[in-house]
Each structure stands twice: as structure tokens, then as C-alpha cells.
């Protein structure tokens, strides 16, 4: 059964009956048949008498459809139907269309065409219509046409229109056939002669078509003439008066009979004329509502085109209706103009949109200056946006700072990482990048297009506006990054308008500076690409320079602090490097790493590739000395490290812990000697490596920086050596003070204090050889000289009236010390000793002196050999003196 149903569905439709089978156009008929579709959408075609009736079809069932006959012509016609399921169908019946003839007295909505009902009113069908668009010469129009302006100048008060009274053949030929040849013109003459003959034939055909009316009219006139000739007596002419009266009465009755019909005709004609006017001039009638719709859609160019067209057609009309319509349209256009002004001034839009709005406003009001209004409003909006943005981000920053403080107080270490200060700088730069190019393009467009007498003054005003915007932007960024760098004049001008941003940690501040420097450079580069002058971007250049200096200073301060913190990492273990027995600890390596890392971080600040024409920091003389001093401070920061080690400038974090031994923090000659070795290594080796790194990072005047740093480090080295010598010399002070000679030695020998001074020198020599062999001679010479000088000063204070035994012992001790310490005794101290000894000649026992010296050489042989062994190496200065 399903197969039969499917087969039935695929059969073509067949029309077997219609109800009714005839009728006028618009008659609703019922179509019956088989397989007339499965539903409404299945029927895809329905033609009744050749007219598409699918639009009026209502599907009822596969065997019934209701439809309405369209505007078909009279006569029988087929019903053609097609479906998706069955395809094209067939019809066994036909529908006949007839046209109902309206009588002369029947009411009708339209005037009845009487050409078919009244004899002699046949329509003229055989007369061809005149082709208005045909060429008068019968030639094809030329593709090249002369300009109307030139023709108007050559043929004033003439026209090329064939229907005009001032028609000029020359104009017509030049306009339509300027490139015609002689042969073409000859053909044109033949065409015009043939056209003239055709016109005569056409007139003859017109008379033939109306021959019945003409003959009927002539016959009627002839019959009337004959009747008049027959009326010979006066009575007949008197009857004519009655006839005239009867004719008038019949005319009056006829008019009364057809009054309603004629009135309806007049009303129909008036309605038809009104509809014709509405259809013909519907553009002006619907223009008001169309303007409103176009305003909602933003189709401004459509509004302007329609308004321009209406203005050209109806601006000077005398028709009251059209004048009223134009008044309403003008009011709508005034609203439209105000809307465009508001959009142009109140809302910042893209440059393309601004240009369109300015163009439209200029078309509506040529005397206005919308470009200048847009520039001034754009400037006010942009400056206000900058200050509003600062307020907005300041509130966020304060809220973030408050939340962080609350978390810290509640011992919650989850601190918000949002950096509103950096977000403010980034957003401000993005605003300038998106809006300043549009402002500049707008200003250039105004300058190139305006012919105002105030153009020069307004150009200066525009430059001042642009400078003010960039100045405010740079000051806002500077206030956020380096508030102390704001000029006093700016602070005085703007007062409290600048925000007081919450304090941020040093590492976040450096990060902000680094990112802000990058975004500022990008801003300058983009503005220069958009043809901004260097004068305009100069405030941003100064901002960039200040940020670079601040960033460089912060990185140097950070590097100095990191070098100072190396005091935690020193272990006082030395390595001997070369034959010169130069020594160092791990500290110089740590120091070099920190310095190089700091220099690497300053690479961005020193770079000159951020934007075209970026100046080097060293190029400005007022910055050069400051930057050189910064790098010198960085390199010589090792002094701070040693100062903290020697408890000279020890911060709180290096304070002695309760369980720590006190001796670990005390300054000793050992630490001083090791520190001197590290300083010498830094001066000799590390400074050269640091200089190469500075050159790689873009630092200028490296030689000057190295020279100043070397001088300061050398002075620091000398100071530490002097401190070491002072500490070594202080070891002799109690020994010298004990030389009172109240008790003399029991045997022939030098005094105990002299022996201890010799042994002290040996110990100092050993310490120097162990920790700073290159300083042994320098330190021991100065120490021995200081000790002997102090001893001589001490002897000079003794009582001069001493006994010969005491004098002899003094000479023995002094001579023994001179002999034992001769390696390090300078010529000056020897002269002083000889002078002092010469003053005692004759007061001491020379024989006992020689015996005591002999005994000293025996008893202190090892100590003397140690001192003499070092003296044997004096020949090679490079192995016993420092290279610094």
C-alpha cells in the first residue's frame, strides 16, 4: 500500500473541473482534479489564462485548489499547474474570460473608454507613435560629444533641442555628429528626405483612419445646408426658433441626465490627477520620513543627496503644498545639522568619520567652519580625558594600596600584583597613540583647505594646542614615575591637579620606569612617523631623557647596594695567582659579576635606538659629569663593602648577632692585607674587564671613568695600607714604653724589649709574606721607621744625666735594633740613629757594645736570618713590591 501511495504521489497533476467556468478578471474559482500537490508548498506553478495566479492560490486537498483569476485578456484559456512531487500537469477544461461593458449611466470608479461602444470612436491603432529619441539625421550618435559650455559660448541664445524655437542646426551637428564625414552627411540628407515622405504618408494614413468621422461631418454639414436652402418662407425660419429652443431644452435635459456621470468623471479625473501627482512627486512627499530613517541608520550621504535634489527641484516653487513640504524638510535638515555637530563635537570619532561629518556640515552650511569647531572641541576633550584618566587610576591605586596594607596587617602574604601606576602610563600612551594622529591630520587638513584671513593665527593656536596636550601628557607620566623631577613652574601652574601616587617598592619602581621608557619611546617613534615635528615631541623627548637618567640612577643604586651586600659572602680565603705572588679572595669575582650584571641592566637606558634621532645621555654636557660620577660610584662601591666589613659603616642588618663571637667582626691586619690584595686585583684586572663591558653596553668616556675609579680605589688602597701600618706600628708602642732601663740585663746582651721588637718585626714579616707578599717591604719599611723613630723620641725624653752603664745599654739596644732591622731601616732613620749615637760618644763602653752585638747575633740567629733572608730578595723589585 505504501508503494501504491508513493506511486500516486509521483503522478502528474490533472485538472478535471472548474467552478465557475467563466468570469471577469478577479473571479475566484475552484479547481478540481487529481494529484494537485501534497501541501501548499508542493505547488510551484499555477497559470490561469496565461496569468500567474500562484500568489492567490489556497491549497485545500490533493483534489481541490482555490485561486483567483488575474488580469487576463478576454477569451478562453488553459489552467496550467506544476508540483514538486508530480511535475508538470495537464488540463481537460478551459476557463473563459469576458469583460463586462459598463453602460453610460452606470456608476464606475474610472472613466469608461467609449471607443468600443460609440460609433466613430474607434481608437487609432494603425498610426505609429512618433519616436522622440530618434536621430534627426538618421545616423548613429557620435561617441565623442562637444562640451556644452563651449557650444553655449559659440552659439549664445541657441539650443540643440529639436522642439525648441531657438533650435540651431550647427549646435545639433557639433553636439551629436562632430566627427561625421561628407559621406555621412550625404546619407543624412537622403534620410531626411525619406523621413519627410514618411511624414506625408503618415498624415495620409491618419486621414484614412478617421475617414468615417470626416465624411460623416461633411455629410451632416451638407444636409444642414440643403435644409436651410429649402426654407424659403418666413414661417419656416420662425420654426427654427422653436427648434433652437427644443435643442436647448434637450441639451439641458441631457446635461441633467449625465450630470451625475460627468460629476463622477470630474471627481475621478481629480483623484487620478492627485494620484498622478503623488506618484510623480512621491520623492518630496516621503522625503521627511526618509530623512528620519536615514538619520537612525547613519546614512548621512543619502540624506544630503536627497536634500540637494529636493532643493534643486522645489527651492523656488510657487505651489503652496510643495512650499509647505520644503519648510518641513528644512526643519528636519536643521535637526540633522545639529545632530551632526553634536556628534562631531561631543563624541570623539575616527579621522575618517570626522572628515565625513565636516564635509556634510560644509555642504549644509558653506559659511560655517566645522573643522575649527572640531579641532577646539577635540583638544578640550583630549586634555580633559588625560586628567580624568589620572583620577581614575589614582583611585584604583589607592584601593590596591589599602588592600595590600590590610593583608600585611592581617599577616596575609597574598599581595595584589596589579600595578595601576604602570597601567595608567600604558593607557595614557595608548590614548595618545590613537587620538593624536587624528588630531594632527585634522589640523593639517584645516591648514591646507582653509582660506580664512585668521589662518596663520589659527595655525599657531593649533600648534599651541598640540604642545599643551603633549606637555600635560609628559607631566602626568613624569609625576607618576619621577614626581620630584616636575619643574616648579609646572607645579605652580597646576597646583594640586597632579596626583600623589602611593609609594611603591624600589624593584616595582624600576620595572615601571623600564616599561614606561619602552612605551614612551614607542609613542615618540609613532608620532614622528605621523609627520609630527621635533618641536611637538620635544616634551616627550625630555620625559624620555629624564626617565633614562632616573632608571640609570636606580640601577646604579641597586648595583651599589648589591655590591655592598657582598660583605655577607666573603670568606677571607686567598688564592695566589702568579709568580708575583699576587693574592685575592673570591670577592673580586663576585664584585665583577655584580658590576657586569648592573651594566647589562642599564643597556636600555643607554640605548639610542628607541626612536629616530634619540640622543645619547652623554651628549648633554649638564648630564655628562653626573653620569660619569654615577658609574664611578658604582665601580668604587667595593669601598662600601669593605667599610661594612671593617665595622665603619655597618648597617642594622649586619649588626652582631647575640651568639656571634666578637672577634669575627674586629678589624685586623690580616683582613686589611687581604682587602688590599683584593683592591689591587680589582685595580689591575677587574677594571679592564669592566671597561670592556661598559663599552659593550654603550657607556661613553670609559677611559675617564676608569681613571677616576682607579684614582679613588688607589686612594682607598693607600688608606687601608696606612691603617695596616698604623696597626703594625701600634704593636711596638708598649715595647718602647717598657724601655725605662730601671733594670739592666744580667749578661752582655740587648734588652728584652729590643728582642721583642725584633721578634715582633719577624712576626709582621711572616704575616705580610703570607697574606700580602707584595706589600712586605713597603709596610715593614714604614713600620720599622715608625718604631725606631718612636724609640729615638722615647730616648730623648729620658734623663740625660744617666749613668754610663745605662748609656752603654741604650747604645747597645739601639745599635742591635739597627743591625737586626737594617733590611727595612731607611736612610733617614739611620741618619737619625747615627746622629743620636754620635751625641753619646765617650759616654758608653765600646768593648762591651761589640761583645753584646756578638752575643745578639748568636742568641737571635734564626730571627736575624729570617730578616736577612728577605733582604736577599730585594734585588728583584717586581717580586717584593706592589704594582699599584
Curated annotation (Swiss-Prot):
* Pfam families attached to this UniProt entry: Sec5, TIG
| Residue span(s) of domain IPT/TIG | 13-98
Kindly indicate whether the keyword Transport belongs to this entry.
yes
User: Coiled-coil stretches, from where to where?
Assistant: 178-206, 846-874
Keyword Kinase set for record: no
- What are the record keywords, sorted? Coiled coil, Exocytosis, Protein transport, Transport
Location of the region described as Disordered in the Swiss-Prot/TrEMBL record: 1-27
UniProt-listed InterPro entries: EXOC2/Sec5 (IPR029175), EXOC2/Sec5_N_dom (IPR039481), Ig-like_fold (IPR013783), Ig_E-set (IPR014756), IPT_dom (IPR002909)
Highest taxon listed in the record's lineage: Eukaryota
What's a single GO CC term here? exocyst
Q: How does it assemble?
A: The exocyst complex is composed of sec-3/exoc1, sec-5/exoc2, sec-6/exoc3, sec-8/exoc4, sec-10/exoc5, sec-15/exoc6, exo-70/exoc7 and exo-84/exoc8.
Q: Which family does it belong to?
A: Belongs to the SEC5 family.
Name under which the protein is recorded: Exocyst complex component 2
Amino acid at each position: 500500500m505504501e508503494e501504491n501511495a508513493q506511486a500516486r504521489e509521483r503522478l502528474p497533476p490533472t485538472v478535471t473541473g472548474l467552478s465557475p467556468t467563466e468570469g471577469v478578471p478577479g473571479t475566484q474559482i475552484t479547481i478540481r482534479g487529481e494529484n494537485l500537490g501534497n501541501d501548499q508548498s508542493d505547488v510551484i506553478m499555477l497559470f490561469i489564462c496565461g496569468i500567474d495566479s500562484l500568489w492567490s492560490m489556497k491549497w485545500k486537498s490533493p483534489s481541490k485548489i482555490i485561486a483567483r483569476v488575474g488580469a487576463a485578456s478576454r477569451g478562453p484559456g488553459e489552467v496550467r499547474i506544476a508540483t514538486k512531487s508530480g511535475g508538470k500537469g495537464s488540463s481537460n477544461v478551459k476557463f473563459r474570460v469576458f469583460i463586462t461593458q459598463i453602460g453610460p449611466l452606470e456608476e464606475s470608479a474610472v472613466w469608461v473608454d467609449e471607443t468600443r461602444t460609440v460609433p466613430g470612436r474607434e481608437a487609432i491603432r494603425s498610426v505609429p507613435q512618433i519616436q522622440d529619441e530618434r536621430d534627426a539625421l538618421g545616423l548613429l550618435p557620435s561617441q565623442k560629444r562637444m562640451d556644452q559650455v563651449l557650444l553655449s559660448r559659440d552659439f549664445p541664445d541657441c539650443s540643440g533641442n529639436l522642439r525648441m524655437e531657438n533650435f540651431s542646426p550647427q549646435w545639433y551637428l557639433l553636439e551629436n555628429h562632430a566627427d561625421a564625414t561628407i559621406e555621412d552627411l550625404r546619407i543624412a540628407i537622403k534620410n531626411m528626405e525619406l523621413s519627410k515622405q514618411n511624414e506625408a504618408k503618415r498624415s495620409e494614413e491618419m486621414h484614412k483612419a478617421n475617414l468615417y468621422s470626416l465624411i460623416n461631418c461633411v455629410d451632416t454639414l451638407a444636409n444642414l445646408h440643403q435644409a436651410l436652402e429649402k426654407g424659403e418662407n418666413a414661417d419656416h425660419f420662425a420654426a427654427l426658433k422653436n427648434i433652437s429652443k427644443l435643442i436647448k431644452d434637450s441639451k439641458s435635459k441631457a446635461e441633467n441626465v449625465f450630470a451625475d456621470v460627468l460629476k463622477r468623471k470630474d471627481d475621478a479625473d481629480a483623484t487620478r490627477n492627485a494620484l498622478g501627482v503623488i506618484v510623480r512627486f512621491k520623492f518630496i512627499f516621503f522625503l521627511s520620513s526618509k530623512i528620519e530613517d536615514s538619520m537612525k541608520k547613519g546614512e548621512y550621504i543619502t540624506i544630503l543627496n536627497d536634500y540637494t535634489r529636493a532643493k534643486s527641484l522645489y527651492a523656488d516653487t510657487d505651489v503652496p503644498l510643495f512650499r509647505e513640504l520644503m519648510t518641513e524638510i528644512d526643519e528636519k535638515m536643521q535637526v540633522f545639522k545639529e545632530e551632526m555637530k553634536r556628534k562631531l563635537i561631543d563624541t570623539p570619532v575616527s579621522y575618517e568619520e570626522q572628515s565625513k561629518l565636516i564635509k556634510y556640515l560644509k555642504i549644509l552650511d558653506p559659511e560655517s567652519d566645522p573643522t575649527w569647531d572640531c579641532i577646539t572641541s577635540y583638544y578640550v576633550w583630549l586634555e580633559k580625558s588625560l586628567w580624568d584618566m589620572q583620577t581614575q587610576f589614582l583611585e584604583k591605586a589607592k584601593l590596591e594600596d589599602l588592600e595590600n596594607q590590610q593583608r600585611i596587617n592581617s599577616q596575609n602574604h597574598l599581595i595584589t600584583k596589579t600595578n595601576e601606576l604602570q597601567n595608567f602610563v600604558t593607557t595614557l600612551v595608548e590614548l595618545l597613540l590613537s587620538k593624536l594622529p587624528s588630531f594632527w591630520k585634522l589640523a593639517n587638513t584645516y591648514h591646507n583647505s582653509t582660506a580664512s584671513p585668521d589662518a596663520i593665527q589659527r595655525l599657531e593656536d593649533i600648534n599651541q594646542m598640540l604642545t599643551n596636550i603633549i606637555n600635560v601628557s609628559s607631566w602626568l607620566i613624569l609625576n607618576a614615575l619621577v614626581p620630584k623631577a616636575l619643574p616648579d613652574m609646572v607645579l605652580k601652574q597646576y597646583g594640586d591637579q597632579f596626583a600623589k601616587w602611593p609609594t611603591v617598592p624600589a624593584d616595582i619602581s624600576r620595572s615601571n620606569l623600564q616599561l614606561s621608557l619602552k612605551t614612551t619611546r614607542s609613542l615618540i617613534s609613532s608620532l614622528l612617523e605621523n609627520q609630527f615635528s621635533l618641536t611637538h615631541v620635544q616634551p616627550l623627548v625630555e620625559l624620555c631623557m629624564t626617565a633614562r637618567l632616573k632608571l640609570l640612577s636606580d640601577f646604579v643604586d641597586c648595583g651599589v647596594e648589591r655590591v655592598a651586600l657582598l660583605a655577607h659572602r666573603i670568606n677571607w680565603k686567598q688564592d695566589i695567582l702568579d709568580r708575583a705572588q699576587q693574592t685575592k679572595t673570591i670577592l673580586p669575582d663576585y664584585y665583577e659579576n655584580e658590576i657586569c650584571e648592573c651594566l647589562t641592566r642599564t643597556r636600555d637606558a643607554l640605548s639610542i635606538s628607541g626612536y629616530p634621532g634619540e640622543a645619547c645621555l652623554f651628549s648633554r654636557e649638564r648630564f655628562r659629569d653626573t653620569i660619569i660620577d654615577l658609574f664611578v660610584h658604582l665601580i668604587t662601591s667595593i669601598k662600601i663593602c669593605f667599610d661594612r666589613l671593617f665595622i665603619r659603616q655597618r648597617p642594622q642588618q649586619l649588626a652582631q648577632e647575640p651568639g656571634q663571637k666578637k672577634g669575627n667582626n674586629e678589624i685586623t691586619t690580616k683582613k686589611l692585607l687581604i682587602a688590599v690584595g683584593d683592591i689591587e686585583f680589582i685595580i689591575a684586572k677587574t677594571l679592564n674587564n669592566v671597561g670592556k663591558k661598559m663599552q659593550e653596553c654603550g657607556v661613553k668616556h670609559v677611559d675617564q671613568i676608569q681613571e677616576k675609579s682607579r684614582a679613588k680605589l688607589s686612594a682607598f688602597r693607600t688608606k687601608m695600607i696606612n691603617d695596616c701600618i698604623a696597626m703594625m706600628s701600634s704593636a711596638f708602642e708598649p715595647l718602647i714604653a717598657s724601655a725605662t732601663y730601671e733594670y739592666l740585663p744580667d749578661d752582655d746582651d740587648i734588652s728584652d724589649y729590643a728582642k721583642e721588637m725584633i721578634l715582633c718585626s719577624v712576626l709582621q714579616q711572616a704575616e705580610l709574606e703570607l697574606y700580602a707578599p707584595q706589600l712586605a717591604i713597603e709596610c715593614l719599611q714604614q713600620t720599622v721607621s715608625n718604631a725606631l723613630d718612636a724609640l729615638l723620641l722615647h730616648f730623648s725624653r729620658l734623663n740625660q744625666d744617666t749613668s754610663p752603664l745605662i748609656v752603654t745599654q741604650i747604645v747597645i739596644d739601639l745599635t742591635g735594633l739597627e743591625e737586626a732591622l737594617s733590611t727595612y731601616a731607611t736612610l733617614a732613620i739611620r741618619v737619625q740613629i747615627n746622629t743620636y749615637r754620635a751625641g753619646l760618644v765617650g759616654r758608653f763602653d765600646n768593648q762591651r757594645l761589640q761583645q753584646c752585638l756578638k752575643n745578639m747575633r748568636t742568641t737571635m740567629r734564626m730571627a736575624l736570618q729570617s730578616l736577612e733572608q728577605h733582604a736577599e730578595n730585594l734585588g728583584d723589585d717586581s717580586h717584593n713590591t706592589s704594582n699599584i
